């Protein structure tokens, strides 16, 4: 295969696609370069689909190699290990816009691998990874509906920024990634500083317009490479079986979808499905061709989809009896766990999140070592989705991709209102335990985390709430749904999550399964989401509308002090012996900054004050004329040395011991004796002269 190269200008960056030199045994492979960021993106697909498979097995793996940044991995083995959180999140970011572009009925196994070979600190890797995946799939000839583009959009000084660098993002009020085709937006992922809905929508449209140059370049690159298209035809529909399923199951399914309780509804639907299968098996008894359960399940699912969608588009109540704008009943409790620092139980319909906040010291910060460099995360958010929350039996292991993704979305939503470490000296960990789930558990986590943070006394800027929106669209008819159920998410055309305060949006995530989503539809969804968000906030505010005035007594108690930086060595001691003795004696954690700032984290205020006193004694300066209580440490013929501070001794000359003449120092003093002395002189060398007889 000849080497093919395509270069185009994308904003301020030059982007290059190459194929034909690397990874030539893959079904499709592209090396994409943007600035000095270089990725190899490969795609491999099996030629045959597995019999009876009713889903599309797409796997996307994004992996970072430390050599890309000129680094050697840490740890004993000195090689890359399990995927990092960033790798998992980027894999999901690539997967989400790709998946809806594969044709319905295509069930061949496909794997996309994006490998970072070189990283430029000015160019984040996710945008070139998405572009490379689109180009590689296009080259492979796998059935795929169009070229996919992607763009990052920032917002600073009232202007949108296209593909900003990491440094520019630090000053940006918005970090938004949008992916789409020539005619449609398919995916949005963003974090914002309480921006208006109009600015968010403008960013989406700006990014979609800007990515057209990339979409055109990918199409030209694929055409120039001239890969052969796969010969694939969608599976034909068995019209006779389809008619039979409709006749036998449509009426009972419509009744089943009037059942508002999720578990009962699912049980009834399963019973209808089982009965259909049993009836079909009885009818085919003795025939050579057995019942095709897979074919039956596909038709049954399509019937479910049509029933639910028609019900909504014709103005009938939704599955649980609501109209399109109504939010499910909400209950809120705070302070539900007696020994946690902050907790909240947020229930919305059949979705429930128990969210717990824990406050820790700087030593509890999470160390991150990736291609962007080493850093500390002072705000940690974890989301757990155990199998019992959906009434299932499942294997309990580490967090799955979905849990990591939902946790990051909830974290994005609340980060803009959480104080930085210099304003609130605690490392914060929030854990959301999903106890029940029927749609929008990530948004329940947002609401619960805002409440749990305020319950813990974290001075957040404002309460935050989130809501998941849905869309049902057939031709020109559509309905935007507020607070969607799990079934509405599964059977609908859009999952649109919006979180924010009463002032503006802090996070927006959108996944669209169809084309034809207009600006007007997105505007309506954002406006309807704002209405729902403000409604949820009003309920939350009735229970807790601002942070508690102080942190929990169970949280670490901070005492902060400042010392002369030259005295730091006195506090630490040789080999750390002094500070270790203080921490053990007072049961405190002590952190010292180079500028002399000392943070003492204690279990109680008393322990913190005790540690502070010890440090004050160690760093105190001797004051001329002040009376001290000291210990005699050494006696000589000409006087006695007395320790008046932990690191300071002074001399009481024999002439300063008593009013009368002293012939022998030992007649008046002994080693270990505690006496009161007055500082009468500090010479240029810092030597201290003391007196006993000059004390009034």
Swiss-Prot record:
GO terms for biological process: mRNA catabolic process; RNA processing. One of its GO terms (cellular component) is cytosol. Its main location: cytoplasm. It catalyses: RNA(n+1) + phosphate = RNA(n) + a ribonucleoside 5'-diphosphate. Its EC number is 2.7.7.8. CDD domains: KH-I_PNPase, RNase_PH_PNPase_1, RNase_PH_PNPase_2, S1_PNPase. The keyword Transmembrane helix does not apply. It is found in: Cytoplasm. Pfam families: KH_1, PNPase, RNase_PH, RNase_PH_C, S1. Keywords: Cytoplasm, Magnesium, Metal-binding, Nucleotidyltransferase, RNA-binding, Transferase. Residues 556-615 form the KH domain. Residues 625-693 form the S1 motif domain. GO terms for molecular function: 3'-5'-RNA exonuclease activity; magnesium ion binding; polyribonucleotide nucleotidyltransferase activity; RNA binding. NCBIfam families: polynuc_phos, PRK11824.1. Component of the RNA degradosome, which is a multiprotein complex involved in RNA processing and mRNA degradation. This is Polyribonucleotide nucleotidyltransferase. It comes from Coxiella burnetii (strain CbuK_Q154) (Coxiella burnetii (strain Q154)). The gene is pnp.
């Amino acid at each position: 295969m000849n080497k093919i190269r395509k270069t185009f200008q994308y904003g301020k960056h030059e982007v290059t696609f190459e194929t034909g030199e690397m990874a030539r045994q893959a079904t499709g492979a592209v090396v994409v370069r943007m600035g000095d960021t270089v990725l190899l993106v490969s795609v491999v697909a099996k030629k045959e689909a597995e019999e009876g498979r009713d889903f599309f097995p797409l796997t996307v793996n994004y992996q970072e190699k430390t050599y890309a940044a000129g680094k050697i991995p840490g740890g004993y083995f000195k090689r890359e290990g399990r995927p990092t959180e960033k790798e998992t999140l980027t894999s999901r970011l690539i997967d989400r816009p790709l998946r809806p572009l594969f044709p319905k009925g295509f069930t061949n196994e496909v794997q996309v691998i994006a490998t970072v070979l070189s990283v430029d600190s000015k160019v984040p890797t996710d945008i070139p990874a998405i572009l490379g995946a689109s180009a590689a799939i296009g080259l492979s000839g796998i059935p795929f509906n169009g070229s996919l583009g992607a763009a990052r959009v920032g917002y600073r000084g009232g202007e949108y920024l296209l593909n900003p660098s990491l440094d520019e993002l630090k000053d940006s009020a918005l970090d938004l990634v949008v992916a789409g085709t020539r005619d449609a937006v398919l995916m949005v992922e963003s974090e914002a500083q309480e921006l208006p809905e109009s600015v968010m929508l403008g960013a989406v449209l700006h990014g979609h317009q800007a990515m057209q140059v990339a979409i055109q370049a990918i199409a030209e690159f694929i055409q120039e490479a001239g890969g052969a298209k796969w010969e694939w035809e969608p599976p034909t529909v068995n019209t006779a079986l389809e008619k039979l399923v409709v006749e036998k199951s449509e009426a009972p399914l419509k009744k089943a979808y009037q059942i508002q309780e999720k578990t009962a509804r699912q049980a009834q639907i399963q019973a209808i499905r089982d009965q259909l299968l049993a009836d079909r098996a009885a009818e085919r008894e003795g025939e050579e061709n057995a019942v095709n359960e897979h074919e039956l399940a596909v038709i049954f699912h399509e019937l479910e989809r049509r029933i639910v969608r028609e019900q909504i588009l014709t103005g009938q109540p939704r599955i649980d009896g609501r109209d399109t704008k109504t939010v499910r009943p909400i209950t809120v409790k705070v302070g539900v766990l007696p020994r946690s620092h902050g907790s909240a139980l947020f229930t919305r319909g059949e979705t429930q999140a128990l969210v717990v906040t824990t406050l820790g010291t700087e030593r509890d910060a999470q160390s991150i070592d990736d291609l962007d460099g080493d850093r500390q995360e002072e705000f940690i958010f974890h989301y757990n989705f155990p199998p019992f929350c959906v009434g299932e039996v499942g294997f309990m292991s580490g967090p799955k991709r979905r849990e990591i993704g939902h946790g990051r979305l909830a974290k994005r939503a609340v980060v803009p209102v959480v104080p930085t470490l210099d304003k609130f000296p605690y490392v914060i960990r929030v854990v959301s335990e999903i106890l029940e789930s029927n749609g929008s558990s990530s948004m329940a986590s947002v609401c619960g985390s805002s409440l749990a943070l305020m319950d813990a006394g974290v001075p957040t800027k404002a309460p935050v709430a989130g809501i998941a929106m849905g869309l049902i669209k057939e031709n020109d008819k559509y309905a935007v749904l507020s607070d969607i159920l799990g079934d509405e998410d599964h059977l609908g055309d859009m999952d649109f999550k919006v979180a924010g305060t009463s002032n503006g949006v802090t996070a927006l995530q959108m996944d669209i399964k169809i084309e034809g989503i207009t600006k007007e539809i997105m505007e309506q969804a954002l406006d309807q989401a704002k209405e729902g968000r403000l409604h949820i906030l009003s309920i939350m505010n009735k229970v807790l509308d601002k942070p508690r005035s102080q942190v929990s007594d169970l949280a670490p108690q901070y005492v902060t002090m400042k010392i002369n930086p030259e005295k730091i060595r006195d506090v630490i001691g040789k080999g750390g012996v002094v500070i270790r003795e203080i921490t053990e004696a007072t049961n405190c954690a002590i952190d010292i900054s180079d500028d002399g700032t000392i943070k003492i984290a204690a279990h109680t205020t008393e322990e913190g004050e005790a540690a502070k006193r010890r440090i004050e004694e160690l760093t105190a300066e001797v004051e001329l004329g002040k009376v001290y209580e000291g210990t005699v440490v050494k006696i000589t013929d000409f006087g006695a040395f007395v320790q008046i501070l932990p690191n300071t001794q002074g001399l009481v000359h024999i002439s300063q011991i008593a009013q009368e003449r002293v012939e022998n120092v030992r007649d008046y003093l002994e080693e270990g004796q505690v006496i009161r002395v007055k500082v009468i002189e500090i010479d240029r060398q810092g030597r201290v002269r003391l007196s006993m007889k000059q004390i009034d």
